[in-house]
Amino acid sequence: MKPRRSARVMVFDPAGRVLLIRCVVMRSDGEFRFWLTLGGEIEPGEEPLTAARREVREELGLQLDVRGPVYTEHNQFEHLREMRDNTDFVFVARCAADAPMMRGVTTDEISMMQEIRWWSAEEVEAGFARGERIFPVDLAARMREFGGG
């Protein structure tokens, strides 16, 4: 299994909602749709905080005060049709922007990223209840723990 390190950022708005991106990827068992926080793979030799700041800049076109990591999480999943042994370094940031927009994403990312929007902790819980795939699975609790909700 190929190791992977990624930086994820819980970006909060003034109301305590977190910004999530709806993604669609092809896996060996077919199409997989899910919501997750901003972020991506840490480049070789890159520090996690540097990667988190880069991902926010690339995906939102913003320079935010990114803090952390506030926690790390280990998981395994299929990425680009290959199983990955992943460690997420999770950070927090605050954003005053009303309407989130994806900027600076690559053509490959555009094909994968379908939608971006703010979610309250209650909306995250309701999404889970409807059967939506939202990562991390304990996002609502993490939102409340780190300043949202």
Task: Kindly give the residue locations of the regions a language model identified.
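Active-site donor-binding loop signature of nucleotide-sugar glycosyltransferases
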Residues: C23, G39, A121
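N-terminal strand-loop-strand
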Residues: M1-L36, L64, G68
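Charged phosphate-binding loop/patch that engages nucleotide di/tri-phosphates or the phosphate backbone
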Residues: R130-G149
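Juxtamembrane/interface motifs at transmembrane-helix termini
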Residues: G40, T87, F146-G148
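Structured alpha/beta reader/binder surfaces that contact nucleic acids or chromatin modification marks
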Residues: T72
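Unchanged
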Residues: I42-D65, N75-R130
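A generic structural signal for ordered secondary structure
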Residues: R17-L19, P69, V90-C95, G149
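Short histidine-centered catalytic/ligand-binding loop motif
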Residues: W35-E43
